[in-house]
Amino acid sequence: MFNRAEITFLGTGTSIGVPVIGCDCEVCASDDPKNQRLRSSILVKTHEVTFVVDTGPDFRQQCLREGICDLNAVLYTHSHSDHVMGFDDLRRFTVFEDEQIPIYAESETMERLKASFPYIFDGEIRYRGYLKVDPQVIEGDFKIGEIDVTPLPVTHGKVETIGFLFSSGVERLFAYIPDAKELS
């Protein structure tokens, strides 16, 4: 039975992070920790599963900061670099296991992951620390442990992306929509 979910915002920054390289505005020049924001990602923990949504270029730093040692799945909202370029850092989560980590993404995002990281998807395990993934193309609602996941189509500029609605049975827990031009 579902008890509760703990959500940690790993990053809430823009696609280039905050502070911005070379910017001397008040926010970027600030020493306030509130103005040190990494790229968008969340960690979701329940008594059954631990998963993240998006693995941007700050993913390794986010994992070290939060002490993340285990993951049961990864969900992707879209294929922009600020959401996927930490993908290779997932190998830490399969290095000591003989299991693959499920990767959930819509077909276009999955194809771009395969194009960007062909060595991960070719099925050849080259060494012990090699990332082993189980690609799961999102085609509708799915479940991770006791969490029901509903993909939410979102317009993000000229790109179609998805957010996620997380539920437990009929109880809606929360939605996560990191990049959106408009919601309908």
Which residues does each predicted region cover?
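Binuclear metal-dependent hydrolase catalytic cores
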Residues: 1-176, 181-184
